Amino acid sequence: FYVILPLQYFLVAIDWFSMFTIFIPVYGFLFLPILSALLGDPAHFLDRSTKIQWALMISVFCISHIPALLTLDISGYEGKNLLLMIFLILVVQSSDVLQYVWGKLFGEHKIAPTLSPSKTVEGFVGGVLSASLLGMLLHWLTPFSAWQAFLMSLLICLMGFLGGLVMSAMKRSMGVKDWGNMISGHGGILDRMDSLCF
């Protein structure tokens, strides 16, 4: 794990796109279970391997695609890739906040009560649409037209919501409410970034 983390970001930094997109899902997922098996402790092997692979996928592989935006070569957008990264983070984080606000104000129908009891249909729809409109207004940060930015934001927000549900399912499976307590009342860093992972 401690070798794969810096290697993944090194591959991003040197802009070796074809390798950083397959390094963890192919090589990491292949060699980590082999290493675990060679260590000779078969007790809970499958459980341990699964947790390591999910940890790599979520906290390293998925997140590493955010700084990878800096390496994209977009014609007519040279030197502005940081703005694309800022756009992504603003849209995703505003979607989370706006879903919470819409849910508190108008939420009545639970969307996934066993995974995340506070999430509502009204919060989801209001938050996703509001954040997508924000993305449309922020299209000037991107190489996209206003409508392209809206559609991109809509897709980003939908995937972020689904990512949040996946992370909630993982937490419920492990019997924890939050990934940490670094941010008082809001859990850990990964709790704030779960939507960005997807």
Q: Language-model features: where?
A:
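Membrane-embedded alpha-helical bundles of polytopic integral membrane proteins
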Residues: F1-L155
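Acidic (Asp/Glu-rich) catalytic motifs at the cytosolic membrane interface
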Residues: V92-E108, A112, V121-V125, L158-C197
